[in-house]
Amino acid sequence: MSAAETNQVQESLEKLNLDSSSSPAAGGATTATTTNNAESSDATSSSVPADSAEEQGESSGIAENSASLYVGELNPSVNEATLFEIFSPIGQVASIRVCRDAVSKKSLGYAYVNYHKLEDGEKAIEELNYTPVEGRPCRIMWSQRDPSARRSGDGNIFIKNLHPAIDNKALHDTFSAFGKILSVKVATDDLGQSKCFGFVHYETEEAAQAAIESVNGMLLNDREVYVGKHVSKKDRESKLEEMKANYTNIYVKNIDLAYTEKEFEELFAPFGKITSIYLEKDAEGKSKGFGFVNFEEHEAAAKAVEELNDKEINGQKIYVGRAQKKRERTEELKKQYEAVRLEKLSKYQGVNLFVKNLDEQIDSEKLEEEFKPFGTITSSKVMVDDAGKSKGFGFVCFSTPEEATKAITEMNQRMVNGKPLYVALAQRKDVRRSQLEQQIQARNQMRMQNAAAAGGLPGQFMPPMFYGQQGFFPPNGRGNAPFPGPNPQMMMRGRGQPFPEQWPRPGPNGQPVPVYGMPPQFQDFNGQNMRPQQQQQQQQQQQQQQQQQRGYYPNRPAGGNVPAKDLAALIANAPLEAQKRILGEELYQRIVATGKAQEPEAAGKITGMMLGLENQEILDLLDDEELFNNHFEEALNAFEEYKNSEGANAATGAPAPSEEA
């Protein structure tokens, strides 16, 4: 299209959209945007082949002086301008609306086109139906506003065992000889490949009956097709139990691969008259080891199942049972799995313990020895990785809940191999995460409500003093003088990489350059001779005492990010007043490492909010990356809302909320 033609199309569409609110299909299109994509290809879930309730939305029917058309099977990239180019040559278009998802605004794959004249609508169906639109043949039919008419099965037939090459147009051409067709649809998968079944909806019941009588059992593209009256999913499910009780079709598997179809039939012939038999084969004509046998009477099928199931034939036990559809079989397997899962949960409820922070030297046998004094242990296991190395946690299962409770009371926080154990009742990961998220969310909401009432966010966490390290610049906490030189975040090393300690380097005049955060006595360095060993030891002791006063411990790796299992031990050995600072340092560095809270104020505020949790909850956050990210995002959003409200108050001249929580 030229630029002038494109502008002309856009102007025409804008003019149409001005009147779209009064057009017959406008209301339907608007309502349809709130629905899910209705182009469902599930034959068993649609009472009509192509114009299901979801697919049609609330579009209007044919008005007295206008025609509303449904256009389906559209490529998601098709928009109103594309459809206008195709439908406008037929006649004057009243409105066009591509139905979109209310949230994502993505096309649902169908649209409504309204003409001013009924004749134009009829002409569009005749000339444009199955016309390729951006690589996909579109499907056009009259829009039906009445949902009862859409869901009616009158005139609706079902066709199965279609050749994959048969599409909507081919099916329409085949069945149009028996009467006026309202809609045709061949079911397809997500890739657009035929599922080998489809539907044809006639205007009258007589035309549908004529098609069933004429085409059922005929060959279409060398395939014998089945044609019958469409039965809705609801009606089929209501008759399912009756079908189970009177089945005639049986499924056989684990058949000897050398078995021929003739031998297969001879195996089942003694039980009654067989109407059809099928042995599945591969592309080379070799048996796949399973097949189906359909008897004329239910009694014959039941007798074959009773006598041949688990019977050994040619050294193999065959399975013989009632043939099931995939959906029914899947549902039964889900029920069996759920029953086993619930039984397992009830069996181990209150007796299975989760133990973490285990030393790497503790294996399953050692774990059982530690817990043996508290009762009878039915099983114990330390979880290991692919290399056989302990993951630092395991499970111990007792015979009674009383024994498990006693073990929790005695062993939780007990030091084993220099580490405090965490012992609690075992929970599924999804349940544990859900509970923890609910607890943290509730506390965050309470903290934010209290902060709002007090006029500000929770107190800011002041980042720790960073001791002199090569190539490292500390982040500027609020209230500190800006640190000169490169951006601190640009200079930060990777997580968990310690920095070698460094003495102050001499300045231009031979005087030592002060190192940020280093005690003054360590800065008296002439750059030539080290101090005597005794004086160095004394200074190291002084430095260690100052570090401990600030909540810093020498057994903690430089650079932070202590593994969670070691951090728990560090917390247990630290004074009560220093525990929050240790956790705060870990949280602060983790928050800065995300790259989303580069401002020191933001990192400090978010750290302060997350420090309001219990120590164990903070350890869980640091141990679970996904859980940490979820709660970090919540805190970040809360901080941004606070900053936005503060900015709005400043713009309007209103006093900003106090930051002193």
From Swiss-Prot:
Region span, Disordered: 1-61, 473-563
Compositional bias per record (Polar residues), positions renumbered to this chain: 1-11, 523-532
Chain ranges of the PABC domain: 563-644
Domain (RRM) spans 67-145, 155-232, 248-325, 351-428
Q: Which GO terms describe its cellular component?
A: cytoplasmic stress granule; post-mRNA release spliceosomal complex; ribosome
Q: Which Pfam families match?
A: MLLE, RRM_1
A GO BP entry:
nuclear-transcribed mRNA poly(A) tail shortening
Matches recorded under CDD domains? RRM1_I_PABPs (cd12378), RRM2_I_PABPs (cd12379), RRM3_I_PABPs (cd12380), RRM4_I_PABPs (cd12381)
Question: Taking the first listed entry, what is the main subcellular location of this protein, grouped into a coarse class?
Answer: cytoplasm
- Stated family: Belongs to the polyadenylate-binding protein type-1 family.
What is the annotated role of this protein in its UniProt record? Answer: Binds the poly(A) tail of mRNA. Appears to be an important mediator of the multiple roles of the poly(A) tail in mRNA biogenesis, stability and translation. In the nucleus, involved in both mRNA cleavage and polyadenylation. Is also required for efficient mRNA export to the cytoplasm. Acts in concert with a poly(A)-specific nuclease (PAN) to affect poly(A) tail shortening, which may occur concomitantly with either nucleocytoplasmic mRNA transport or translational initiation.
Q: What is this protein called?
A: Polyadenylate-binding protein, cytoplasmic and nuclear
Q: Which gene encodes it?
A: PAB1
